[in-house]
Amino acid sequence: YKRILQLKQVLDFIEHNYASPLTLQQLSSSVSMSPKYFCRFFSEMTHQTPMDYLNHQRIEQACYQLSTTDDSITEIAYRNGFNDLSYFIRTFKKYKGMTPGKYKRS
């Protein structure tokens, strides 16, 4: 039960802070765990790494903004925690199978 509460706590932390430049240290500190233990804990509970989960949340928010605003891809990338446009495009393509530009046009 404690593990589920810890997972909920870190998922809430990510949900409220995904747009910030979060580090593994910050995520693990939010549930008072060492980074190494936190990675193992998070992966066991969610079947993905903490950073994969964080990037997935960021990409989902970016998708929503791409389809509901006229903001530029660069603005959306930065607003969702990506401080490198090329990394955002690569990550977006990894999760969605297309570039943000193509997604916005579809």
Regions found by a protein language model. Give the residues of each.
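Intrinsic-disorder/low-complexity linker and hinge segments
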Residues: Y1-I4
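Basic/polar phosphate-binding segments, predominantly the helix-turn-helix DNA-binding elements
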Residues: Q9, F13-E15, P21-Q57, D71, ...
